[in-house]
Amino acid sequence: MKHLKIDHLGIAVPNLEQAIAAYEALGFRVGATHDVPTEKVKTAFLPLGESHLELLEPTDSSSVIARFLEKRSGLHHVCILVDDLDGALDEMRAKGVPLLDQVPRLGAGGCRVAFVHPKGAGGVLLELKERERT
């Protein structure tokens, strides 16, 4: 499995507009926003070098992000960009790494993603994102 880079850091926020204002005050600019109905979140991506910060606001109290914010706030996940998501999942399964997603699903912007259980990654929720093929 070839890792290309950290794609983004996902940060759970209770209010997207307030969070954007705080980051803009630091000099960040919003690169893209997405409504992800399947995950019940709104997101904003802020470029940071070759990576991004992803701010995530829940749109429903039943979303994973809403439940996360009830317990804590802040860093939610680290996203690793990979060449071949199916191959990466196969390799992780072969090594006994617990997965939250056995098959890829669509993430923000329509890209293919899958999550690794924090128990298999030292307590960190990892998102694997497949690099767009050109």
Regions found by a protein language model. Give the residues of each.
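Short, structured motif recognition centered on aromatic/hydrophobic residues
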Residues: 6-13, 23, 46, 53-56, ...
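A cross-kingdom feature marking solvent-exposed beta-strand/loop segments within repeated
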Residues: 6-7, 26, 31-40, 59-76, ...
